[in-house]
């Protein structure tokens, strides 16, 4: 029997799951349980414990009994590992306690992840549970990139630094880009653009990140679906003092009512493009601001790296929106960046080159697979403890 890993991504109102074989990369099953704790859902899912049972029931209804899956571990995506949790970590009670201490750094993401881990450990007590952290890949950012220019004593006391996020995706995609090009990862200088509802950019030299757009939290950097990205901190003070908004109100606005949705009232880029075509000025502005910020980061990372071999687009928007890719890189031929219009328009779902032959900088589209990366991280940290079926 092939060994497999159950990968869980627990949010406040949803649990995404996937069962994968880390050795072969085969996806055995996947799905999502949504509207946890919400009234009026098609199937009442009162809490995360009920959601876990729905996961098991869904697997069984698809013909995948737990006993027949060859499960050897459960992998959990955790957004923030702070400074000390930066490797795939076998979860024990001490790990849970430390994650709870870190929750103020990721108040929207870590608490539901912790809850998911606790529920899964009770449901599957005989399997090792492994936490894999979004921040891990960026743990060793150069000090100049990781440090905020604020009072050093305050920063040190409260562990304030640029942690970076989407690290599992950035690492996986950079490795896949090297494999696609059949070039050693250590020899490549790369820019990776992870463009989904959450969005981030990274500059990677020889397989190690030297810059990334997200910071202490996933709010910094690029314009995102509902998050503002970079914003003058003075805006927060102004709204607090002048508009009478509380810190909680401002945080909710910057996280949930900003970005493309805040400007254009929409996070689905397919709808956004339709509205732009019909002359919607708000949709056009939202798109223009989104593209402008992306181009700003691409330019900054060209300067940071000095020379670039590969630019790679990934995640939902990056993989599927040819117009975004075109507009981010248009007019940059002086820097060696060109797109082949036909290749860029290709709807293929596999890794592919979208720059013309001979272009100084290769541009790729590489599908991300964070679930497989987490499954393989579990296999890596557990090693011989897993055995083979």
Swiss-Prot record:
InterPro entries: Ac/propionate_kinase (IPR004372), Aliphatic_acid_kin_short-chain (IPR000890), Aliphatic_acid_kinase_CS (IPR023865), ATPase_NBD (IPR043129)
Domain of life: Bacteria
Biological process (GO), any one: acetyl-CoA biosynthetic process
EC number of this enzyme: 2.7.2.1
Required cofactor names: Mg(2+); Mn(2+)
Residues that hold Mg(2+) according to the record: 9, 370
Residues that coordinate or bind ATP: 16, 194-198, 268-270, 316-320
Keywords noted in UniProt: ATP-binding, Cytoplasm, Kinase, Magnesium, Metal-binding, Nucleotide-binding, Transferase
Pfam families: Acetate_kinase
Binding residues for substrate: 77
UniProt-annotated location(s): Cytoplasm
GO CC entries: cytoplasm
Molecular functions (GO terms): acetate kinase activity; ATP binding; magnesium ion binding
Annotated catalytic residues: 134
Residues under site feature: Transition state stabilizer: 166, 227
Manner of cofactor binding, per the entry note: Mg(2+). Can also accept Mn(2+).
Gene3D superfamilies (alphabetical): 3.30.420.40
Segments traversing the membrane: none
Pathway(s) served: Metabolic intermediate biosynthesis; acetyl-CoA biosynthesis; acetyl-CoA from acetate: step 1/2
Catalysis performed (reactions): acetate + ATP = acetyl phosphate + ADP
Family: Belongs to the acetokinase family.
Known role: Catalyzes the formation of acetyl phosphate from acetate and ATP. Can also catalyze the reverse reaction.
Subunit structure: Homodimer.
Protein name: Acetate kinase
Lineage start: Bacteria, Bacillati, Actinomycetota, Actinomycetes, Mycobacteriales
Gene: ackA
